[in-house]
């Protein structure tokens, strides 16, 4: 059993590395940001998605899912290289997820979204799971998780300073990379 878990863990790490996109290291900038929160709830009925926001950002609904997942992102106006926090609730503690800043437009023919950051660099992308070796964030029994990432504005073929991007939670390789929840984010001017 131990060998199969190790092999599965290695395969899972390889799948994660292949799934997440690479980019140039972010440029560090020190500037204060006013913190705000945004919430998007996604449920089985995609027309019931709602958003509460202290900014004027609009929201899009994700594909229908079984969970009622909420993401609270702070700050809402991201600065490349600074910390961003995802407070996530409604997750299945037995499930597996990724959290990252991603393109708001899906990749045609590919379930894996284009996200910012470097491949397998868990400073800009997180893997949430209680059962997978190598996961970077555990999910509490009540379905909550806190993810702290470095806000990264660019990825392969993605520039969130000029393209619409979202803070996204999506299923890991065991969940088919399905969309779970997302909330629009913007990067503050440098």
From Swiss-Prot:
Signal peptide segment: 1-22
Domain of life: Bacteria
Residues with lipid group (N-palmitoyl cysteine): 23
Lipoprotein recorded as keyword: yes
Residue ranges of the region described as Disordered: 43-68
Compartmental location: Cell membrane
Entry membrane topology: Lipid-anchor
GO biological process: thiamine biosynthetic process
InterPro entries (alphabetical): Neocarzinostatin-like
Low complexity composition-biased segments: 47-63
Lipid moiety-binding residues (S-diacylglycerol cysteine): 23
GO CC annotation: plasma membrane
Keywords for the protein's UniProt record, in alphabetical order: Cell membrane, Lipoprotein, Membrane, Palmitate, Signal, Thiamine biosynthesis
Function: Is necessary for biosynthesis of the 4-methyl-5-(beta-hydroxyethyl)thiazol component from which thiamine is formed.
Name of this chain's protein: Thiamine biosynthesis protein X
Record organism: Corynebacterium glutamicum (strain ATCC 13032 / DSM 20300 / JCM 1318 / BCRC 11384 / CCUG 27702 / LMG 3730 / NBRC 12168 / NCIMB 10025 / NRRL B-2784 / 534)
